[in-house]
């Protein structure tokens, strides 16, 4: 992609989940993966979601996401390198990663690129829900945490083996001083470290360990966060800085699915919006119900709210709903839940008022479970 913030094009990778073309009524959360120039890190995210994550046992939370990889280049011809992307300008002098001739100072521009150019591009070219997760490793994990503090860039954050001590523990200090309780909506924050903090061949030094200890101690203290924020802090002793990425990412993504199932399914905003929902199929007969995550949808009672049969092929309903609205269709019991052909498994979700008119289609071979 061309960018007004850089003198070079930004390489971006985009993965869409299986069924994306078929499931035209599903709008997907987006995961932004940094350091995607290491292709294995980008590929691990969608592979682990499909192969190593336990699905929500209640069937409400899908493991399908759009994955966007942001590559950080090494461009010798213009003297631009990975560390430029992930480090700000120093506040405490030119030492450590900020020595004269080192590479730093463009992290504010990378944030602007993501917020002002990449996210709008993804939104206009793909069916997105509006919810986002940022994933980083090592210095890109530091960038992800810094973006949480300075720009509130994503909704959720996974930081694996972050450098928390650069620029005289700047990131650790910023996290300790940030007012996390100001955010009331659900949020997931995961941070981990491998053998970098343990005595042995993988030890990365006392400063690295001290920075991590400050950040991990803060994140573990629930009193710093609102009740809708879930933090998970883990360590993986015996793994090195690089081979610890996979076990940590596996744990993080599984925690994230659990967070979604427990915290996102029940959450709704304060405002209500007009919504029109149709269910289409052949030879429809009464009764057909819609049920979901709020009073106007019957609060997940199997006989939630009866839909109007406008013909033998269309049932519809008009409601004012809090968003995100999550719902399913039944014939009056959970044993007779609708089988939908044009939406992903899990709850059907209306995330925002831009996509408040929905048309769902029953599977032609079998409309309902148990029939």
PLM features: residue spans?
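Non-catalytic cap/lid and distal C-terminal segments of serine-dependent acyl enzymes
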Residues: 1-270, 291, 295, 310-315, ...
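Low-complexity, intrinsically disordered short peptide segments enriched in small/polar/basic residues
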Residues: 119, 346-347, 356-359
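Compositionally biased regions
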Residues: 224, 342, 357-358
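A short, amphipathic beta-strand motif
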Residues: 273-281
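Aromatic-rich carbohydrate-binding modules that target alpha-glucans
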Residues: 281-324, 332-353
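Compositionally biased low-complexity segments at domain edges in trafficked proteins
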Residues: 355-371
